[in-house]
Curated annotation (Swiss-Prot):
Binding of substrate, residues: N102, S128, G129, G130, H186, N187, Y191, K260, R287, R445, H451
Stated name of the protein: 6-phosphogluconate dehydrogenase, decarboxylating
Enzyme class: oxidoreductase
Keyword ATP-binding: no
Length: 468
């Protein structure tokens, strides 16, 4: 009996849809799930597909041609380790395990090291695009042994999303945990994008009292210009969706934003690397404070503050918010790609930032027209320290920073919280400052802890007895 070309473990929605995607590209696929019912359900719902169900790990592994290619789509963490442990007794040296889950990159580094020592290949692969992307074409970020990637590249290339220029949204990212790291930063950028959009929405509601229909029209217009992106596109649809009672759905959704922890991972890594990922970190904190609903309701009855006044001319303020949103987005990506650079140096990954931006252009949640500008910036100068220094982004900062400053000033004066817009201004001004007040902090540290300091007029390291 002929062997199957690839196996998929895990038949929850992402695993199921990726298996169907692979099958639709002409590959034969073995499927396995820990619970028999899920596998039977997939087969029953997809008659005529070249999906071969197996109900024991041994039979599943033995059904695959060698070197075996096995895609894991199981719950990250202990579930991934358990799945790997169940496979290992039946694998041969040179077989390839692909982890497509939302896995913490340090776990991927560990698994890659452990499996390599046993003669197996391990490819930690970020997959973005949600359920629809998994089925129709996601953005794929594989990392691991380059030679093993070459053996799975034809399949990954066929199932990936395709950008407008015909390029598949997949590329080899780098060694061990590089793929999952890039996916993690992608998710952090996603947090930043979503919070910036939410703050723009809050400003337009608070400053202009725009109706849902007006908001939808505004976002439709924005989506036809520089802000063209998946998130802007879906947001315009959200504003006009009504429930069964005729209420605008967005207006009756509880204002507590959940999270799965990947934004937190991005911020934690930034702290480990000493990277000022302020905007994305504020977007994580914004979700946390949103979850304090009961406290916020109680505080709203006790803590005073200004009531929002009209922002003035409607068209003028909408344009200011649009410009502020675009520049805020640029700052967020500048921070994210700066962190990728720091991680690449720390973990010896040799990341290609332009290629990373290219694979974000379709299939994934942060897909946006302006990603081509990032690719262009790195093509012009692969070693650029920060995207804000690239000519296009510098020009946008020159043109739009006053709008961002005006919007933040209006928000502060009118009691509208805009943590990520404010973070964008603070980062921009800090990054362009030749001199910061950190000299005083160094003096304080030396005063209470003898931590020493450097001087601008002399070489060396100094300590002062401040009480003399």
């Amino acid at each position: 009996m002929s062997k199957q070309q690839i196996g998929v473990v895990g038949m929850a929605v992402m695993g199921r849809n990726l298996a169907l995607n692979i099958e639709s590209r002409g590959y034969t696929v073995s499927i396995f799930n820990r619970s028999r019912e899920k596998t039977e359900e997939v087969i029953a719902e997809n008659p005529g597909k070249k999906l071969a169900p197996y109900y024991t790990v041994k039979e599943f592994v033995e059904s695959l041609e060698t070197p075996r290619r096995i895609l894991l789509m199981v719950k990250a963490g202990a579930g991934t380790d358990a799945a790997i442990d169940s496979l290992k007794p039946y694998l041969d040296k040179g077989d390839i395990i692909i982890d497509g889950g939302n896995t913490f990159f340090q776990d991927t580094i560990r698994r890659n090291r452990e499996l390599s020592a046993e003669g197996f290949n391990f490819i930690g692969t970020g997959v973005s695009g949600g359920e629809e992307g998994a089925l129709k074409g996601p953005s794929i970020m594989p990392g691991g042994q380059k030679e093993a990637y070459e053996l799975v590249a034809p399949i990954l290339t066929k199932i990936a999303a395709v950008a407008e220029d015909g390029e598949p949204c997949v590329t080899y990212i780098g060694a061990d945990g590089a793929g999952h790291y890039v996916k993690m930063v992608h998710n952090g950028i996603e947090y930043g994008d979503m919070q910036l959009i939410a703050e723009a929405y809050s400003l337009l509601k608070g400053g202009l009292n725009l109706s849902n229909e007006e908001l939808a029209q505004t976002f439709t217009e924005w989506n036809n210009g520089e802000l063209s992106s998946y998130l802007i596109d879906i947001t315009k649809d959200i504003f006009t969706k009504k429930d069964e009672d005729g209420n605008y759905l967005v207006d009756v959704i509880l204002d507590e934003a959940a999270n799965k922890g990947t934004g937190k991972w991005t911020s934690q890594s930034a702290l480990d690397l000493g990277e000022p990922l302020s905007l994305i970190t504020e977007s994580v904190f914004a979700r946390y404070i949103s979850s304090l609903k009961d406290q916020r309701v109680a505080a709203s009855k006790v803590l005073s503050g200004p009531q929002a006044q009209s922002a003035g001319d409607k068209a003028e303020f909408i344009e200011k918010v649009r410009s502020a949103l675009y520049l805020g987005k640029i700052v967020s990506y500048a921070q994210g790609f700066s962190q990728l650079r720091a991680a690449s140096e720390e973990y010896n990954w040799d990341l290609n930032y332009g290629e990373i931006a290219k694979i974000f252009r379709a299939g994934c949640i942060i897909r946006a027209q302006f990603l081509q500008k990032i690719t262009d910036a790195y093509a012009e100068n692969p070693q650029i320290a920060n995207l804000l220094l690239a000519p296009y982004f510098k020009q946008i900062a020159d043109d739009y920073q006053q709008a961002l400053r005006d919007v933040v000033a209006y928000a502060v004066q009118n009691g509208i919280p805009v943590p990520t817009f404010a973070a964008a201004v603070a980062y921009y001004d800090s990054y362009r400052a030749a001199v910061l007040p950190a000299n005083l902090i160094q003096a304080q540290r030396d005063y209470f802890g003898a931590h020493t300091y450097k001087r601008i007029d002399k070489e060396g390291v100094f300590h002062t007895e401040w009480l003399d």
